[in-house]
Amino acid sequence: MGAAVDSLLHQRRPAGIVIVISDFLLNRTDYEDALSRLLAARHQVKVIHVLGEIESTGGYPPGLYRVRDAETGELRETVFGPEAAAACRRKVEQLAAAVRGFCTARGIAYAQAFGAGTLDTFIERELPALGVVR
């Protein structure tokens, strides 16, 4: 996200509306810094927080998984079951609350689009609320 913001800011465009679409699965300081730099450049920032249905609900089928840590690249094996699903949902709720809280405190419009099943609702309610469509 930081590199994308750097690229935009180096173009020396006049301030305008910037819509950031991200899963925000990165270090909190990274997205906070990127969004803060957009605000400092006087852009009107709007955030669309996206996650897939399975990721946002912890709806993975139970079983053994081999996963790669996005930060370290390390491969690990993990067993996914009801406890892991609940932990996944808690993490998603915490992440969404952190991003929403950061945005709200700084006047950044925030919309959550988790799962394809919510697409119609998102288009009908959230995009107008963001001021993207009428």
Residue ranges and their predicted role:
Residues M1-D6:
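Small-residue-enriched hydrophobic alpha-helices in membranes
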Residues V20-I21:
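Generic enzyme active-site microenvironment
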